[in-house]
Amino acid sequence: MKIIYVTARLPYGADEAFIIPEIRQLQESGHEVLIVPRSCGGPLVHGRELVKYASIETLASRRVCRTAAGVLLKARGRALAALWPLNASRSLSIALKNVAVIPKALWLADVAAVWKADHIHCHWAGTTATMAWLASTLSGIPWSFTAHRWDIVENNLLAQKARSATLARFISEDGLRMARAVGLGPEVHAAVVRMGVDLPEETAVPERTGAVVLCPARLTEVKGHRFLIEAWRILKDRGVAGELWLAGGGELRPRLASLIESLRLSNSVRFLGVVPHSELLNLYSAGAIDVVVLASVDLGGGNHEGVPVALVEAMGHGIPVVATASGGTQELVLPETGILVRPADPVALADGIERLLSDRVLRKRVGDAGRQRALDAHHVARVARELAKAFEAAQRRHAATGAEA
């Protein structure tokens, strides 16, 4: 199949590395994939090797505007009919965001037709899905989308998009429940297909005197870093040796740095900044990390953790994890596969981390169980096969509909 993948920024930026294994696996399975980022520019942090598979144009480049004008001239009535549902956008800000991607959506319809795409798939149910939806309507090529978390909460015409799509994919049961709560109907072909990750055939066992605890997460409020830092102070007061590494960038770094200094932790807490995905996996493969921690919190209004790919990757490398019972994390970290603690509770976090650091046998047992959990639910080969089957089924249904017409 020839599949177009619409992303927010990938191959650019630092936030969509979790999509890369899925794309690679589809390519290795014999499918052609063309990546179309909604927005372009910025650093090639994770996706440098994907640029050659991408069609890159800014939202309103000369080529995009020229092609969009041509599509409007050739199929004005169909284009206006495709655009009409955008009137139902539930707020002015969402409507303006949808309007902003119209030229690129029209351009995408032309690109998909010229490339002879069999299917259009997009990640995120926001404006990337608006692009894919409009392009599908104009080109007649079936489409689908993957919804994550914030994009479900935003509810940018989610139910309307899902009715048009051949598959509304959710990465967690929690996400599907959230979508049902904002109007996703029973007539929609919706399914939970979890994110797939690359998992190594072998895992490394750390051989060090000082422990390394890693938190691979953006420095944002929902990730709960302040509770982890407070937990680290508790561990230091208990005499626990080792370092805490924070991998990720974000607006909270100055505030967290001040907290670290005020708690006298500057000698044992390190900011790694944004770590390229391949380098992060190399740390895991080399046995450089003893425990991975996510201290995520629920901020209300659906603003909580999905199923964190960062945890899946660590578990897949046999690294034991400590996480908070927030959002979709509870679907991933089951009893014996990791340590799950109350959110926003530094003492509970400290206790969970100390349990693992103080007991090598427990670390090995939890790490092995976590790895098996990741293999069973998130191996990218299985996930990509499931997606490819869904895309192929959509193509068959589309062909049958065309034959009947």
Mark where each language-model region is:
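Nucleotide-activated donor-binding/catalytic signature segment of Leloir-type glycosyltransferases, i.e.
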Residues: 255-281, 286, 290
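A conserved mid-protein helix/loop that constitutes part of the nucleotide-sugar donor-binding site
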Residues: 17, 210-234, 239-240, 251-258, ...
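A short, well-ordered alpha-helix in the C-terminal region of glycosyltransferases
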Residues: 268, 348, 355, 362-377, ...
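Conserved acidic donor-binding segment of nucleotide-sugar-dependent glycosyltransferases
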Residues: 332-346, 355-361, 376
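Donor nucleotide-sugar binding/catalytic pocket of nucleotide-sugar-dependent glycosyltransferases
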Residues: 37, 152, 158-202
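N-terminal subdomain of nucleotide-sugar transferases
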Residues: 1-63, 141, 404-405
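Short hydrophobic beta-strand element within catalytic cores of glycosyltransferases
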Residues: 293, 311, 316, 320-323
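Nucleotide-sugar-dependent
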Residues: 278, 282, 287, 294-309, ...
